[in-house]
Amino acid sequence: VTAEAREAGLSQDPAADGERPLDIALLTYKGNPFCGGQGVYVRHLSRELARLGHRVEVIGSQPYPVLDEGAEYAGRLTLTELPSLDLYRQPDPFRTPGRGEYRDWVDALEVATMWTGGFPEPLTFSLRARRHLRARRGHFDVVHDNQTLGYGLLGDVGAPLVTTIHHPITVDRQLELDAAESRRRRLSVRRWYAFTRMQKRVARRLPSVLTVSGTSRAEIVDHLGVQQDRIHVVHIGADTDLFSPDPAVRQIPGRIVTTSSADVPLKGLVFLVEALAKVRAEHPDAHLVVVGKRPEEGPVAQAMERYGLEGAVEFVKGISDAELVDLVRSAQVACVPSLYEGFSLPAAEAMATGTPLVATTGGAIPEVAGRDGETCLAVPPGEPGALAAALSRLLGDAELRDRLGAAGRDRVLRNFTWAKAAEGTVSRYREAIADSAGDGPRRSPAGTPRSAPLPPGPSAQGAPGAQGAQGAPARGTGTPPGPEAAQADGPAGVTRTVRDSEAVHMTEAAS
């Protein structure tokens, strides 16, 4: 682009929709795909937005997002690290930072909230993000928040705000409370999920909300009180190039595969373990492979011991994308036993590989998996007997497996791809920008490239980096109680831009 074109606010090439490319700030307080579905969302959506010709800057905290590389969008996808104190990193979660690690009052707030049993990251990330965005006013056409829902994002963040809410975390909170067996545990759950009060207040003031399913839309209205006309459904999906059938991968007789991002009631893993015990009476070779971390205690560990299934249940974590896909391909059946999901990426990804699916009807899972007997076998949530019957039926019927597997992949290709998700998201970006046009100019002239990044601020003395890994690539979208940490470093070729500038006054975050 020539200097004259820059001055005129012109862009060299239009985006895929024929309009001017957008400069997008995509915020995520926990963006690593090894941590949960929010990281998967950021990884794939950012890539597809860049493929459409837009410039995407992902702004995230530890464990840092993993972004994809691609020659066709080189230079249009960057990562900005906005470091926290990384209090939940492995192998020392709930750690107390050293004196030299504290940089400002937000750090002190983060530690104080953890010490009192709360989960600070949505609030503290939002405060740091607000400070960062205000320092870079005029750089972005739109700010897209990936379910931070923190006080720091209320008011003017320098560009129109669009927010994704995958599902209300209040659903997770209620399921945790229902499963709590003691008063002490219930008190702990309430304290951990105290941030949901903030999220309710923030959600009600948001101008534009994206969500991933009609079920989530209804839950957001009911649980968070958001006006329905502010909520837009944009389905997400599977990477159908990666998750695809491969006849060269041998299916293992009796293999059932599932994904469990955390040992929490919402995922329903304990019911699948109980179902496996019943299935093995009819199919002795039936065994379960769980993509996730093995629980050392709790209901799942107790069920495995009670039914003598230690040798029939395997947990795998930290595997690559290719290894994950081959694992799903090798299974005769994939299973989603969740009590509730706002979408269910595991269902879409399993179906995309052509692996037949048994899934519950919890939450939005039927929107993804389709009708019972047509694209999956569907069972009520929380019923191990029904799960066992469906699993046994599929394990014993090769023709049914083939039919459901083919129909499932066709359903995903028609409805649930990341390319479609990106196109729908851009449409909502442009609507938000148009709706805010009456508020006065928010950025530099259209098409003007972003100015050079701010110089990096001084690194915090002894500031920790994200370490360790908790689980394999996980596909849930909630924030389960307890520490989550994952490998922080993405591909070496991904550009890392400016860290939070210390030149920005701390008081801006609270103003």
Language-model features, listed with the residues they occupy:
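Short hydrophobic beta-strand element within catalytic cores of glycosyltransferases
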Residues: 356-359
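A conserved catalytic-core segment of Leloir-type glycosyltransferases
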Residues: 2, 14-21, 59-127
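Nucleotide-activated donor-binding/catalytic signature segment of Leloir-type glycosyltransferases, i.e.
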Residues: 298-319
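Conserved acidic donor-binding segment of nucleotide-sugar-dependent glycosyltransferases
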Residues: 371-372, 376-384, 393-398
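Conserved donor-binding/catalytic core segment of Leloir-type glycosyltransferases
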Residues: 249-276
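Acceptor-binding helix/loop patch of EC 2.4 sugar-transfer enzymes
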Residues: 92-117, 157-200
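Carbohydrate-associated surface elements
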Residues: 215, 237
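Aromatic "clamp/platform" in nucleotide-sugar-dependent glycosyltransferases that forms part
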Residues: 339
